[in-house]
Each structure stands twice: as structure tokens, then as C-alpha cells.
Amino acid sequence: MSEAKAPCLCVPTTHVREVLGDLQGFAARNHVLHETLWSLMADGACSFRSRDHARSGYSCETDETQKQIITYLILVGDGRLLTYTRAPSGGETRLHGKRSAGLGGHVEERDVSYTWRDGKSVPYWRGTLDMAAERELAEETNGALVFRPHDTHAILTHTCSPVGFINDDSDAVGRVHLGIVYQVAVTEPQRLTFAHEIADARWEDPQSLDLDQFEGWGRIIVETLREGRIK
């Protein structure tokens, strides 16, 4: 039997639409990003759900009533965007062989951070998203990039911040995922190495890319960068 998949954070699709409307593509939230996240992940809206049908008899991977929350990290450096091909051993199998413009990861129970409110400890979802993004970034860059600048394993300086949301209901993969987009600005991109799931990594000018080579979210990110809508 294949390795078990950890449950991941989901939000009801109806709630996503209540908060974000009929978003198709990228939406920057700028100064209201935190407030939008707070509304999206309000008390009672979020739940951790199985992705492992073989073990539980249910998988959110095919449940279009739920959106899996993905931290989607786009790496930029020297005016170029990291693109890569999804290797057969990594990530969403329905996207293998296509080029991507972001490192995407599920939010798992181990990422949950807490805050104190009304006399009790409750999940702090913005911090939880940051923890998930941090873990994904460290895993995919072999520990070279981490959020904590004092970490002795971090060999390259960078900044990382959430810049908006990405959604695409045009295919089966997109209908069960919602991306929280983080932009990672790397000072020395040429020194980065990546995990084995990241194949044929290149730093490329978004203006020169062939959109037909990219999966759905990748196309959206490239188009958004070309339009200057991610600052």
C-alpha cells in the first residue's frame, strides 16, 4: 500500500464563494488580505479532511463541496520567475509533466499555530498558513530558504509575504483547491537547489514564457506577473 497522505485543511466551497465571490484567476487583496483571510477561515468554517480514500473511504481530492487550502509560493529573483516541471514522484498526479510557476503545499495539522482569545487557546489561521508555507519552502529548497532569518540552515536571504488568492474552477483539479499566493523574493537565485520532485528548474522572464506549457495556476501567475498585478 502506498504511503498514507496526511489530512489537509479544507473550507466549504460555498463559504469560499461567500467571501471571495466568483473569483476565477488571481485576486490581490493588499491591505485587506488579513481581514479576508480571517473571514475565509472563520471559526467553524475550516476542517481537516482525509485525502486517503484507500484508508478512510473518503478523499477531499474528489469532493467539490470542499476547497483544499494550498499555500502557493512563487519565487522571483533578478527579475525572473522560477518555473519547473512536475516530476512523476511529486505532488498532484493530474499535473505531472506540465510546467508550474509555484511551489504548492497542503496545510496539515502539524502546521496549526494558536492564539489566546476569550480565555482559551484557539487556532490562529494566518499563522498556520505561514507555518505551512515555511515548511513547503524549506522542503522544496533543501533547507536553503526558511522564514526565520536567524536560522543557521538558511544560506540565502529572501523576503516572503502573502499577496493574494488564486482560484480556477475550469478543471477537476482547480475545483477542489484554493491557493493563498505568497511571493518569495530571492537575492541569489542561481545558488538554489531543489528537491527531486522539482525537475528542470529554470529562472525565466515571464514575458518570454509559452503559456501552453503550464498547468492552470501557472498560466494565471505568469499572466498576472506580465500585467504587473503582483507587487
Locations of the language-model features?
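N-terminal leader/linker segments that precede catalytic domains of diphosphate-processing enzymes
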Residues: M1-L192, I198, E204-K231
